[in-house]
């Protein structure tokens, strides 16, 4: 019987017991006798009922033990795939409740409503602007083609090795698109397929041809707030698009071949290898600390672009690619590709009629994030002349995808930068989301009332707290974050895990789940922050609470011993390991902002951790040596604490 059904613990022995047992017969006899409250009939009925219930309890306990043992064995033999397969199939109950939509009661109507919504979203903000840019592009492209002959592409031939590299970059286990092909088809196919694909891709580049199926996608609406039990509005959904696997392979080939034409400013931290949110937060924290140390209040403007990826103008993008001298074959191929972009919406078992995407990058496309970064790169270039500077680096504007944060030493400078943003976004046919764009201050003058910061439309609110890349920045005399909301998310996730496990008592399994699924919530981006002892204590308490509940104790010394013998370190020591690993990567980072700021200011951060654990400087064998040093330090701490008691 499937684990998702109501009585997954039921087995054939219980069925036989139910048939052969006198439980039902004694119950019927008791009912026929008028349901007496005493006497031999009443005693017989209760005895049979108890026997039957005990058999059910035994079956339930056996099933829970079996699941727990399977999970434990998967951990012991280091089979993470099997572990999560067992967890999802036998522990996580699959919800049978359909997502309810406001004013819609059937899948056909829902699919049509989503189709209309997504087709409207993927249209230009200004149709006249789009027509004007289309004419401008057509004129520019005719001149561009006359300068760059098509035979210049003969040197850009795709080979089987490049196709293999592209296939290796794609994640496994993703859903198939219209063609029903998945990555597993390519990884298990005959090697000659790679040669055939290489010839196909080469011909596509030379002739600027794109197969029509490369432009097809299936959009699946996902609610932005999945935990809400209320009826959802259509506007509260975002689309996840499934693209053909062969188009993804081709896009990876394009990324590898034409990377030099797609480079962007180091102030853009998204869509780059070995660079992420932690790097952006690290640079932000150091810039603010640097200015506060020099008695200057930093003014921050957190700007959000409304539906940035869905409103990208194709013709502006192609003209930007031409300015970068992208081969004309590639530009024309992208033009044809985007003109063939059609999506269908799938809701339940219903598939909508296709609709054309008139604006926005292709959802689910491998090239899409990089093309968007190219699209907004000129904005960062213009802002480089304004705002904060540090060691000769322009750090006045930092960007992660479509999230912009401006840093200025004065309100006047911040106002000037915001107006520049508005002007540049108008040239891109993009608009600010004024409801999500805010400003705040950090430094000694953070409490002073300030004049309004205005955009081309309205004023931006001054706030005391805002969310940036998953961390909650707080206005104050120094750089600080609010961890209370992080702790709330952590408690919610940990309670969900413990509720799923129920009475299954296996600390190894529970700790593995908490460490892999819940602890990342609590420790998100900590390596980029310089945590005080107070902040570490605040974060340590919820992590210790999990051990208190699991091992049924409130003694901190016992909790430390449990952490030692289970191999799960406290937050402060895990923070040290993550921070030192992060610093060792910053030294060789390809991002000039991260690398130069670390070389100029990272010495104190490293010295603090090195002194605490008597470490040497970070080097290549960090993982094997530094982790052992931190664990030994924790072991010595626990040993001393035990001896003192």
Question: Where is each model-derived feature located?
Answer:
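Non-catalytic, peripheral interaction segments enriched in hydrophobic/basic residues
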Residues: 1-4, 10, 55, 64-66, ...
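Arg/Lys-enriched, amphipathic patches
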Residues: 1-108, 112, 116, 120-122
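Surface-exposed loop/turn segments and immediately adjacent short secondary-structure elements
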Residues: 80-235, 241, 245, 249, ...
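Short, conserved micro-motifs composed of acidic
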Residues: 153, 349, 430-465
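Conserved catalytic palm subdomain of right-hand nucleotidyl-transferase polymerases, strongest
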Residues: 172-181, 219, 232-242, 279-322
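Active-site palm subdomain of RNA-directed nucleic acid polymerases
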Residues: 254-269, 371-407
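Catalytic palm subdomain of template-directed nucleic-acid polymerases
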Residues: 307-324, 399-426, 443-444, 475-477
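Acidic catalytic cores of enzymes that act on phosphate-bearing nucleotides/polynucleotides
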Residues: 555, 560-645
């Amino acid at each position: 019987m499937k684990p998702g059904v109501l009585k997954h613990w039921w087995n054939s022995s219980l069925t036989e017991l139910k048939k052969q047992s006198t439980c039902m017969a004694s119950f019927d006899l008791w009912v026929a006798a008028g349901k007496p409250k005493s006497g031999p009939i009443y005693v017989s009925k209760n005895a049979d009922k108890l026997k039957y219930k005990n058999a059910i309890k035994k079956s339930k306990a056996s099933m829970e033990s079996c699941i727990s043992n399977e999970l434990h064995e998967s951990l012991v033999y280091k089979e993470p795939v099997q572990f999560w397969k067992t967890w999802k199939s036998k522990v996580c109950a699959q919800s049978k409740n359909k997502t309810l939509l406001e004013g819609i009661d059937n899948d056909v109507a829902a699919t049509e409503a989503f189709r209309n919504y997504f087709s409207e979203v993927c249209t230009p903000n200004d149709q006249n602007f789009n027509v004007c840019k289309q004419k401008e592009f057509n004129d520019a492209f005719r001149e561009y083609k006359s300068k760059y002959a098509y035979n210049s592409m003969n040197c850009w031939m795709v080979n089987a090795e490049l196709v293999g590299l592209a296939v290796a970059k794609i994640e496994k286990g993703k859903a198939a698109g219209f063609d029903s092909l998945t990555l597993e088809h390519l990884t298990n196919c005959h090697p000659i397929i790679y040669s055939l694909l290489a010839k196909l891709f080469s011909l596509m580049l030379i002739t600027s041809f794109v197969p029509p199926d490369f432009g097809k996608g299936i959009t699946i609406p996902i609610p932005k707030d999945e935990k809400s039990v209320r009826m959802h509005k259509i506007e509260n959904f975002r689309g996840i698009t499934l693209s053909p696997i062969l188009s993804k392979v081709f896009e990876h080939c394009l990324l590898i071949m034409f990377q030099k034409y797609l480079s962007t400013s180091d102030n853009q931290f998204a869509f780059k290898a070995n660079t992420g949110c932690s790097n952006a937060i690290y640079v932000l924290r150091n810039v603010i600390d640097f200015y506060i140390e020099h008695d200057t209040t930093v003014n921050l403007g957190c700007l959000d672009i409304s539906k940035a990826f869905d409103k990208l103008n194709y013709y502006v993008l192609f003209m930007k690619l031409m300015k970068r001298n992208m081969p004309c074959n590639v530009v024309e191929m992208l033009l044809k590709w985007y003109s063939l972009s059609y999506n269908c919406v799938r809701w339940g078992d219903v598939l909508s009629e296709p609709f054309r995407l008139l604006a926005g990058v292709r959802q689910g496309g491998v090239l899409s994030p990089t093309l968007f970064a190219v699209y907004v790169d000129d904005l960062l270039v213009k802002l480089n002349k304004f705002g904060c500077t540090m060691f000769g680096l322009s750090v006045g504007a930092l960007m992660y995808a479509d999230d912009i944060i401006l840093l200025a030493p004065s309100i006047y400078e911040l106002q000037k930068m915001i107006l520049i943003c508005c002007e540049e976004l108008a040239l891109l046919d993009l608009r600010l989301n004024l409801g999500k764009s805010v400003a705040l201050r950090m430094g000694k003058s953070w409490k002073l009332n300030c004049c309004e910061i205005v955009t081309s439309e309205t004023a931006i609110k001054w706030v005391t707290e805002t969310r940036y890349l998953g961390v909650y920045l707080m206005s104050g005399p120094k750089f600080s974050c609010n961890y209370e909301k992080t702790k709330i998310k952590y408690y919610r996730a940990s309670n969900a895990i413990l509720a799923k496990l129920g009475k299954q008592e296996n600390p190894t399994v529970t700790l593995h789940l908490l460490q892999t699924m819940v602890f990342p919530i609590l420790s998100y981006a900590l390596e980029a922050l310089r945590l005080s002892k107070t902040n570490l204590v605040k974060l340590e308490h919820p992590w210790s609470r999990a051990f208190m509940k699991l091992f049924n104790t409130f003694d901190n010394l016992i909790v430390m011993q449990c952490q030692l013998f289970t191999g799960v370190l406290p937050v402060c020591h895990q923070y040290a390991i993550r921070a030192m690993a992060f610093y060792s990567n910053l030294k060789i980072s390809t991002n000039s902002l991260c690398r130069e700021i670390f070389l100029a200011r990272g010495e104190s951060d490293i010295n603090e951790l090195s002194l605490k654990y008597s470490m040497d400087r970070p080097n290549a064998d960090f993982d094997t040596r530094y982790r052992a040093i931190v664990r030994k330090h924790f072991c010595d701490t626990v040993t001393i604490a035990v001896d003192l008691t």
